[in-house]
Amino acid sequence: EATLEPDTAGCAQTRAGNPVPDGTYKIYAIDAGGTRHDGLTGTMTGGVFTPSGYWELEAGTYTFVCINNAVTDNGNELYANLNYGQMPLIGVSDPVTVTNPFDVFVSFVMRHPQARIRYQFVSYTEPIESPSLGWLNSDPTFGVGSAYFDLKGNRLRDGGTSAVIFYNSGVLHLNQPYQPSSVTKEYTYTTDYILCSPEYNSMTYYAITSNLYGRAVHSNKGVQVGPLQKNHSYIWKLKFKNKDPWYLYNDGTIGSLAKRGSRTPIGIVVKEKLSESDQGTACALNLIYGSWKNVGDNLVENVNPSPTSIIEAAADMNGYNWTYQPNLQGVVRANEPTTYPAFYKAAHYNPGVPTASNIGQWYLPSYGEWIKLVQVFDKTYAPSATESIYPHHSTCNITMAKVQSAFTNAGSTSTIYGGPLCLCSTEINESPTYCSFWADNSLYSGICWNTMGSQFLPFVHF
């Protein structure tokens, strides 16, 4: 995913600032009739302007203009090279009234006739490893690499130079050191600012080589970036997203298998934790067998009225409550190994290793939470309003071998698809629900009798 955005971090720096860059500067004035009056030259050092002499003007109203030595003064017009590496500055005052014999103080805001752009490469949870920006340049956009301006800094025409930009240093800045976390962090590598013509709107090519999420990355593509506005800052972001699941580790952090280190994966993340105050969710790696209930009484137990459709069931995210809060009959099902085996076994699931304090209690997931697991592998999947509540196949865009590999590669010994009818804590009317990975591009879901023995995946919050 690629975006071009205003660079709010750099907006305060878009103007030349104080002090302005050292160098040679020239100041002239234009009277109300449009006649130019040459004035001062001087040097800027550490924000202090030292003129080469003094300047007297007849009384009148003038617009004052200041340019640095990167701007060529042709007498009746100005010329500036807008390619990377140049930094022309033009400052134009508001009209000033000069009354002799008094001194006049004129201030300038020095502006770039160029735009500034940074390139940023974004990853999540884990930073790009040892990125190398091999090159960054462009197809030459004809003519706009330089420009002619009138004496007040207004652009007149293109200067005939191609708008090729380069980033010779290849320097990339990481926003924060890598630290495994339970929160999905954003890591960025960013270039320094690059100056370019605001009319520059051709394709910009970049080549970045690195490793990320356990894969070698070599991205060499073109993107549209313009047109831009002069004296504005932009940031072009390229976002690298992980196509594989994130894993919950025993120490309460998440990440890819490639950076597991000494950590042990205990689950697949089905809902990311986006801030410290947020709550993430993961599913266990291994299936458990049990029945929803051992008494065939077909009661509404969770909430009254109970969901009546697949769509309503998919909106239920309360598996933890159905496991640990008293049901409508006043029973905490997590505490009932005989009557509610699935709830009890889910609540007592053991991932096989000690876990951190931020990992909560395991529970029997709701139907909606199970759909979140499906969406880990098919982000476009959503239940249909016309789906039957009775056992049926629904279409998804999932290769089941990929699902199985996601579990097996993390140490699971369970066969995840093709057979297990994974029980959920949600009821439709008075019947339990289930949802299962079945075959390529196919799920199998619906309602079942409450005494049906089947398998399920415990879930946990972190």
Where are the regions that the model predicts?
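Short consensus segments that form the blades of beta-propeller domains
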Residues: 14-19, 353-356, 448
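Residues within well-ordered beta-strands of beta-sheet-rich folds
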Residues: 65-67, 118-120, 282-284, 363, ...
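Short, flexible beta-strand-to-coil junctions
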Residues: 30-34, 67-72, 124-126, 209-213, ...
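Extracellular structured ligand-interaction cores
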Residues: 22-24, 61, 105, 114-116, ...
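Short aromatic-cysteine micro-motif
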Residues: 272-363, 367-380
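Sec-type signal peptide cleavage vicinity
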Residues: 1-247, 297-303, 308-324
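GGW-centered surface loops in extracellular recognition modules
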Residues: 232-290
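C-terminal, surface-exposed recognition/capping segments
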Residues: 368-462
